[in-house]
């Protein structure tokens, strides 16, 4: 999957470049080679995303070290005006030396994405968070905010998504079916019966009180200024799209399910000629798989 993600990053970078405006000469980006920043060090921004603001691109991503996949530094930020030459802006969101904090050093912090809120003038970061020492059990969404694009960002909270809320695309008949589902009847995974139950909302019901799981994720701001949180949920079996509040710092409770039981992650979304397109990968760990789009 790392090769796949690298290819996607190169493709997205190329697309953004052709849509941008810059008269600066560009140096070639050579696939497979170390990509240095302005200090000559490799760009350390894994699982990242690029935000364009006031003529500058900002690349946010996970700082990774050689010894662990856990977050020992936090979220890095790099800036560029041409998408080839990147300046290290430093740590945008730091993990902390406090084990009582959700973002304690050693937690798992992945897929940071940043959007700008024109109403508040704030920059808002969302990310996938797993609590220190808990593996991938927490499946939380974290949020932080800053007055400037590169940060520093102030951590606000983390948690599951839309606790106590059913998807808005579940009609009365679907809710009636949901009421009949009992997890004890589907303890064996990957059977046709289990898959059908997941499709009908088995895990939505299981997680209703505590909130929906949120792992691989992205953000999208529509033309009307409404922002959406798109994430892999329900044990990575179903994608969900959740509406964010006007300040982009919380969820409104409105969300829909996409490709139930489809087993997709790593979502990316864009709009072209009035149609929304979503690209995802399958769930095969670090092994490559075919892209899907809808």
PLM regions: where:
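C-terminal motif of bacterial Sec signal peptides marking the signal peptidase cleavage site
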Residues: 19-20
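Surface loop/turn motifs at the tips and blade-to-blade linkers of beta-strand repeat domains
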Residues: 39-41, 104-105, 208-210, 257-262
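Hydrophobic core segments of beta-strands in well-ordered, beta-rich domains
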Residues: 46-70, 90, 110-136, 143-144, ...
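A short loop-to-beta-strand structural motif that recurs across blades of beta-propeller domains
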Residues: 74-76, 141-144, 240
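Blade-loop segments of beta-propeller domains
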Residues: 76, 83, 87-118, 129
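Beta-propeller fold detector
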Residues: 87-93, 154-161, 252-259
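Asp-box/WD-like beta-propeller blade repeats and closely related beta-sheet repeat scaffolds
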Residues: 128-221
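Conserved small/polar residues in nucleotide/adenosyl-binding loops
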Residues: 293-294
């Amino acid at each position: 999957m790392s090769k796949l993600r690298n290819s996607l990053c190169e493709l997205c970078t190329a697309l953004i470049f052709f849509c941008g405006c810059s008269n600066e000469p560009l140096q070639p980006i050579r696939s497979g080679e170390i990509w240095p920043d302005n200090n000559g060090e490799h760009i350390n921004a894994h699982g990242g995303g690029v935000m364009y603001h006031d003529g500058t691109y900002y690349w946010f991503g996970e700082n990774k070290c050689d010894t662990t996949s856990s977050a020992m530094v936090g979220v890095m930020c790099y800036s560029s005006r041409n998408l080839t030459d990147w300046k290290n802006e430093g740590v945008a969101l730091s993990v902390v030396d406090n084990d009582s904090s959700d973002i304690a050093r050693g937690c798992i912090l992945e897929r940071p994405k940043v959007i700008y809120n024109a109403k508040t003038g704030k920059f808002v970061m969302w990310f996938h968070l797993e609590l220190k020492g808990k593996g991938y059990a927490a499946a939380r969404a974290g949020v932080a905010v800053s007055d400037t694009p590169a940060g520093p960002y102030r951590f606000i909270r983390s948690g599951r998504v839309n606790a106590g809320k059913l998807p808005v695309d579940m009609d009365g008949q679907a809710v009636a079916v949901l009421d009949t589902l009992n997890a004890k009847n589907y303890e064996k995974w990957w059977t046709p019966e289990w898959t059908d139950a997941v499709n009908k909302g088995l895990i939505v019901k299981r997680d209703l009180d505590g909130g929906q799981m949120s792992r691989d994720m992205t953000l999208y701001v529509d033309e009307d200024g409404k922002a959406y949180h798109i994430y892999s949920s329900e044990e990575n079996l179903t994608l969900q799209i959740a509406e964010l509040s006007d300040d982009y710092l919380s969820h409104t409770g409105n969300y829909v399910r996409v490709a139930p039981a489809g087993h997709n992650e790593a979502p990316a979304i864009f709009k072209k000629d009035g149609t929304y397109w979503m690209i995802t990968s399958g769930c095969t760990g670090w092994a490559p798989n075919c892209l899907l789009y809808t």
